[in-house]
Protein backbone atom coordinates (compact mmCIF):
# COMPACT_ATOMS: atom_id res chain seq x y z
CA UNK A 1 0.00 0.00 0.00
CA UNK A 2 1.47 3.35 -0.98
CA UNK A 3 1.24 6.58 0.98
CA UNK A 4 -1.61 7.98 -1.12
CA UNK A 5 -3.72 4.84 -0.69
CA UNK A 6 -3.07 4.95 3.05
CA UNK A 7 -4.17 8.59 3.25
CA UNK A 8 -7.33 7.74 1.26
CA UNK A 9 -8.09 4.96 3.73
CA UNK A 10 -7.64 7.26 6.73
CA UNK A 11 -9.69 10.15 5.36
CA UNK A 12 -12.53 8.04 3.96
CA UNK A 13 -12.81 5.96 7.13
CA UNK A 14 -13.15 9.10 9.24
CA UNK A 15 -15.66 10.67 6.83
CA UNK A 16 -18.03 7.74 7.51
CA UNK A 17 -18.80 9.47 10.81
CA UNK A 18 -20.12 12.78 9.44
CA UNK A 19 -23.40 13.75 11.10
CA UNK A 20 -24.56 16.70 9.00
CA UNK A 21 -25.18 16.77 5.27
CA UNK A 22 -24.43 14.36 2.46
CA UNK A 23 -21.12 14.19 0.64
CA UNK A 24 -20.41 12.24 -2.52
CA UNK A 25 -16.79 11.82 -3.58
CA UNK A 26 -15.52 10.55 -6.90
CA UNK A 27 -11.99 9.48 -6.08
CA UNK A 28 -8.99 9.79 -8.38
CA UNK A 29 -9.37 6.10 -9.30
CA UNK A 30 -13.05 6.55 -10.24
CA UNK A 31 -14.49 4.97 -7.10
CA UNK A 32 -17.67 6.68 -5.86
CA UNK A 33 -17.90 7.11 -2.10
CA UNK A 34 -20.93 8.38 -0.20
CA UNK A 35 -20.96 9.81 3.30
CA UNK A 36 -23.69 11.14 5.56
CA UNK A 37 -27.45 11.11 5.10
CA UNK A 38 -28.63 11.10 1.45
CA UNK A 39 -31.98 12.53 2.61
CA UNK A 40 -30.32 15.63 4.10
CA UNK A 41 -31.03 18.81 2.13
CA UNK A 42 -27.40 19.92 2.52
CA UNK A 43 -25.48 18.11 -0.23
CA UNK A 44 -22.09 18.51 -1.88
CA UNK A 45 -19.76 16.55 -4.09
CA UNK A 46 -16.04 16.39 -4.75
CA UNK A 47 -14.35 15.03 -7.83
CA UNK A 48 -10.72 14.35 -6.94
CA UNK A 49 -8.41 15.00 -9.88
CA UNK A 50 -4.99 14.44 -8.25
CA UNK A 51 -3.91 11.28 -6.46
CA UNK A 52 -2.25 13.21 -3.61
CA UNK A 53 -5.42 15.10 -2.55
CA UNK A 54 -6.14 13.24 0.70
CA UNK A 55 -2.46 13.13 1.60
CA UNK A 56 -2.36 16.92 1.29
CA UNK A 57 -5.39 17.23 3.58
CA UNK A 58 -3.66 15.15 6.22
CA UNK A 59 -0.44 17.06 5.77
CA UNK A 60 -1.72 20.62 5.57
CA UNK A 61 -5.36 20.76 6.63
CA UNK A 62 -7.60 23.60 5.51
CA UNK A 63 -4.72 25.53 3.92
CA UNK A 64 -3.93 22.54 1.70
CA UNK A 65 -7.63 22.18 0.93
CA UNK A 66 -7.81 25.79 -0.28
CA UNK A 67 -4.57 25.42 -2.24
CA UNK A 68 -5.85 22.23 -3.87
CA UNK A 69 -8.98 24.06 -4.96
CA UNK A 70 -6.96 26.92 -6.46
CA UNK A 71 -4.69 24.42 -8.26
CA UNK A 72 -7.75 22.62 -9.71
CA UNK A 73 -6.81 19.36 -7.96
CA UNK A 74 -10.48 18.76 -7.18
CA UNK A 75 -13.78 20.19 -8.28
CA UNK A 76 -17.20 20.57 -6.71
CA UNK A 77 -20.61 21.62 -7.98
CA UNK A 78 -21.33 23.65 -4.86
CA UNK A 79 -18.38 25.08 -2.93
CA UNK A 80 -20.66 26.86 -0.43
CA UNK A 81 -22.37 23.61 0.54
CA UNK A 82 -19.03 21.82 0.73
CA UNK A 83 -17.68 24.45 3.12
CA UNK A 84 -20.87 24.29 5.21
CA UNK A 85 -20.70 20.49 5.46
CA UNK A 86 -17.06 20.81 6.52
CA UNK A 87 -17.92 23.46 9.13
CA UNK A 88 -20.88 21.55 10.55
CA UNK A 89 -18.77 18.39 10.86
CA UNK A 90 -15.60 20.13 12.05
CA UNK A 91 -15.03 17.74 14.97
CA UNK A 92 -14.91 14.85 12.51
CA UNK A 93 -12.81 16.75 9.94
CA UNK A 94 -10.24 17.70 12.58
CA UNK A 95 -9.48 14.02 13.15
CA UNK A 96 -7.48 14.02 9.88
CA UNK A 97 -7.08 17.68 8.88
CA UNK A 98 -3.46 18.69 9.31
CA UNK A 99 -2.64 15.47 11.14
CA UNK A 100 0.89 15.50 9.71
CA UNK A 101 1.44 19.27 9.93
CA UNK A 102 4.87 19.40 11.54
CA UNK A 103 5.13 23.18 11.80
Predicted regions, residues:
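Feature captures hydrophobic
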Residues: 1-103
Amino acid sequence: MNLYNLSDTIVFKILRDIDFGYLEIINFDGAILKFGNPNDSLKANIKIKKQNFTFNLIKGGSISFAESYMKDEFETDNLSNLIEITARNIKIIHKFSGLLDLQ
